[in-house]
């Protein structure tokens, strides 16, 4: 069995303060054979109680440069792959298609972080409707995303 983690966030993601080096060193120390760094890239992510609007965007050229350098540095200790976790929204299909054609990602997670512009992580998403209605809307949006976007390898956060 190959020990691999393919869903890792570093300082490139607004929700992590871990350096890429510290993540790779931890993987080596745990005896892992491979990792794929998949920082959040969520175009049009709105302001939330925890993050400012646009927080989950970063410089992809810098990202590839840094991770490519570390792939070489760690090549005898750990297989390092370059991935990304994109935030699916139906209107972003063409944007993500162009992005994944431009950058040679090893792995792309397509995650459903927003339902009609709202983050279901926060209780406000559920206000004014039953849980059943909220989940129905969430799954309807998931289906819409899957019909309009195919620029990813694995679906993330289907049910948060």
Regions found by a protein language model. Give the residues of each.
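An N-terminally biased module of ancient metal coordination in phosphate/nucleic-acid-related enzymes
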Residues: 1-90, 99-102
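Domain-core and long-helix interface of multi-subunit machines
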Residues: 12-14, 86, 102-105, 109-160
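Short, charged beta->alpha transition segments
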Residues: 67-70, 95-98, 140-148
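Short, conserved acidic/polar surface loops in the N-terminal third of protein domains
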Residues: 91-95, 119-122
């Amino acid at each position: 069995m190959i020990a691999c983690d393919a869903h890792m966030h570093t300082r490139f993601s607004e929700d992590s303060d871990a350096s890429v080096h510290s993540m790779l060193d931890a993987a080596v120390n745990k005896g892992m054979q491979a990792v794929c760094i998949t920082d959040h890239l969520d175009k049009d992510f709105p302001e939330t109680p925890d993050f400012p609007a646009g927080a989950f965007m970063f410089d992809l050229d810098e990202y590839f440069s840094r991770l490519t350098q570390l792939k070489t540095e760690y090549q005898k200790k750990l297989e390092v792959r370059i991935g990304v976790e994109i935030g699916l929204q139906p209107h972003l299909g063409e944007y993500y298609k162009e992005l994944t054609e431009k950058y040679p990602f090893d792995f792309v997670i397509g995650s459903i972080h927003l339902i009609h512009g709202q983050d279901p992580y926060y209780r406000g998403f559920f206000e004014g409707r039953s849980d059943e209605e909220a989940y129905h809307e969430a799954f309807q949006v998931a289906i819409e995303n899957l019909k309009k976007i195919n620029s990813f390898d694995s679906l993330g956060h289907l049910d948060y």
